[in-house]
């Protein structure tokens, strides 16, 4: 029942999961994703203005010259208009590029992480290691995460998204994800957290996240990696620090 209510909250109150025919962003839970959404919205506004301007020009020119089919035959060259349609798009691209570069730099920057989680992609599941924590037997806390088969799904669980084991993390904590793969190229992607990083064999890629609210966040492998590519979901549970420590003691 609690699982059902939690998923209902995520789907209705917080849009943290994919929905049928959803062509929009999921609600952000990290500063990185908030920056991505803000950049997208700002760019879309100016693109709509440009679209309206270009459409108006095309309509005006078409209407004007359709009334006088002779005029365009004597217009062979227009240096002014050529300069305008060369410089104006270049300026627009520069305006878009600068905030994009700033956001890209901030997303790649790993700021004094309080903990590190290693995510290893394999065909076709994920393996996680909490490198900073050791259990009672002196081993690193680690586990594997598999998709729950359709015939074993419980009420409120999501097809091809829920897993048998979740990655539990504390909120308001700088977390570094170190991502790699053991066989082929995978991709570690969680839309609500603004995370998307390649998992490449023999290479360690890293990305940071500061989750600002509790909740359950879903992701998937976003790189075609074989026949069961769709069966590599990612499930992140963000909880309070006391709840995280309690979970950690149980491992």
Swiss-Prot record:
Cu cation A1 binds at residues 186, 221, 225, 232. The chain crosses the membrane at residues 43-64, 83-107. Residues 1-15 form the signal peptide. The signal sequence of COX2 is processed by IMP1. GO terms for cellular component: mitochondrial inner membrane. It is a multi-pass membrane protein. One of its GO terms (biological process) is ATP synthesis coupled electron transport. Pfam families: COX2 (PF00116), COX2_TM (PF02790). Belongs to the cytochrome c oxidase subunit 2 family. This is Cytochrome c oxidase subunit 2. It comes from Lachancea kluyveri (strain ATCC 58438 / CBS 3082 / BCRC 21498 / NBRC 1685 / JCM 7257 / NCYC 543 / NRRL Y-12651). The gene is COX2.
């Amino acid at each position: 029942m609690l699982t059902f209510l939690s998923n209902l909250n995520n789907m209705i109150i917080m849009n943290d999961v994919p929905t049928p025919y959803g062509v929009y962003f999921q609600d952000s839970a990290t500063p990185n994703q908030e920056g991505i959404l803000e950049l997208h919205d700002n760019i879309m506004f100016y693109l709509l203005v440009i679209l309206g301007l270009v459409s108006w020009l095309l309509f005006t020119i078409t209407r004007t010259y359709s009334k006088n089919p002779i005029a365009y035959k004597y217009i062979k060259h227009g240096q002014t208009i050529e300069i305008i349609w060369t410089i104006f798009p270049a300026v627009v691209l520069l305006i878009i590029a600068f905030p994009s570069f700033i956001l890209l730099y901030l997303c790649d920057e790993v700021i004094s992480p309080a903990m590190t989680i290693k995510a290893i992609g394999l065909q076709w599941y994920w393996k996680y290691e909490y490198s900073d924590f050791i259990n009672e037997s002196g081993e690193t806390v680690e586990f594997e995460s598999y998709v729950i088969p359709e015939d074993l799904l419980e009420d409120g669980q999501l097809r091809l998204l829920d897993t048998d084991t979740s990655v539990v993390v504390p909120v308001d904590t700088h977390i570094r994800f170190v991502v790699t793969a053991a066989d082929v190229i995978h991709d570690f992607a969680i839309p609500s957290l603004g995370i998307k990083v390649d998992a490449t064999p023999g290479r360690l890629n890293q990305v940071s996240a500061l989750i600002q609210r509790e909740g359950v966040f879903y992701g998937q492998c976003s790189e075609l990696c074989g026949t069961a590519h769709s069966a590599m979901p990612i499930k992140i549970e963000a909880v309070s620090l006391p709840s995280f420590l309690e979970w950690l003691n149980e491992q």
